[in-house]
Amino acid sequence: MKRIAIDAMGGDNAPKAIVEGVNQAIEAFSDIEIQLYGDQTKINSYLIQSDRVAIIHTDEKIMSDDEPAKAVRRKKKASMVLAAKAVKEGKADAIISAGNTGALLAVGLFVVGRIKGVDRPGLLSTIPTVTGLGFDMLDLGANAENTAKHLHQYAILGSFYAKNVRGIANPRVGLLNNGTEETKGDPLRKATYELLTADNTISFVGNVEARELMSGVADVIVSDGFTGNAVLKSIEGTAISIMGQLKQIINSGGIKTKIGASLLKSSLYEMKKTLDYSSAGGAVLFGLKAPVVKSHGSSDVKAIFSTIKQVRTMLDTNVVGQLVEEFAKETQVND
């Protein structure tokens, strides 16, 4: 049985969306147990009772505007902190939260702990593309500043995730840059390019420009955390704007526009699915001793369900256990 600890109080739509997502997951998957951390009365308002769902009551929670590290230190009974402690103590196998990103990174690093040999765990997310296959990108903001060694390690982590969770036999790795030529980029990108080219365990396809990301040019995209986060927000904003503009055009158009939209309804629905990040699950702080997954702050029921499904797959494939073994081998070789 896979045991998943969930911060029921994190996110814009908590606890309603969190609990209703859990209800759907419990019905869909018979091999999971959920531990919900938060206000018991509020949780029970939405929970469909199940012997595979436990509520661990606490009145304390970390707010979206709390200073992350300080909040984790001071709010020791916060729902997010208690969920992370459950993982550390072996009472749960993974943690999910839609709450304060910085706080989740802090509890991930300082409570759950990083895998020996991993310098900087990266925030990884699977982003939908027009091909329908998507790509994994990291770092998406766990680390604002990185070295070439960190980015090289992100390529290793991303490839490992793509192979073991998404089932891609030989993931193509691209380096996000301001041009595709080998000589492009700042010193960080140039140094990273050399490291990735020299590593024959990685299928490196070279530099990738931001405009190429959605075309499926690579399965894994490597970036420093500052740039990666900015690109992610840009992709999300563009997708929301496109769908909003389409809706506005259809609603304000004449009868011909509405008839055309009706005829294209299934195609427009497929387009919406392609651009919908909620079906891809959450962002994984990859490189820790257990799955720590950040669901979007505005997650709805569908997004929470997808994140639970994603974590279930991670536990099913034992991707973290395999990663621990992989880095243990590298550590032995380096020693």
Curated annotation (Swiss-Prot):
Supply the source organism for this entry: Streptococcus pyogenes serotype M1
Identify the domain of life. Bacteria
Looking up NCBIfam families in the UniProt record yields: plsX (TIGR00182)
Task: Identify the metabolic or biological route this protein is part of.
Answer: Lipid metabolism; phospholipid metabolism
The protein's job, in short, is: Catalyzes the reversible formation of acyl-phosphate (acyl-PO(4)) from acyl-[acyl-carrier-protein] (acyl-ACP). This enzyme utilizes acyl-ACP as fatty acyl donor, but not acyl-CoA.
The record lists the membrane-crossing segments as none
Q: What is this protein called?
A: Phosphate acyltransferase
User: Which HAMAP family does UniProt cross-reference here?
Assistant: PlsX (MF_00019)
Instruction: Provide any one GO MF term from the record.
Output: phosphate:acyl-[acyl carrier protein] acyltransferase activity
Q: Which UniProt keywords apply?
A: Cytoplasm, Lipid biosynthesis, Lipid metabolism, Phospholipid biosynthesis, Phospholipid metabolism, Transferase
Subunit structure, interactors included: Homodimer. Probably interacts with PlsY.
Compartment(s) where it occurs, according to its Swiss-Prot or TrEMBL record? Cytoplasm
* GO CC annotations, alphabetized: cytoplasm
The family annotation for this protein states: Belongs to the PlsX family.
Entry EC number(s): 2.3.1.274
Query: Please, one GO biological process term?
Result: phospholipid biosynthetic process
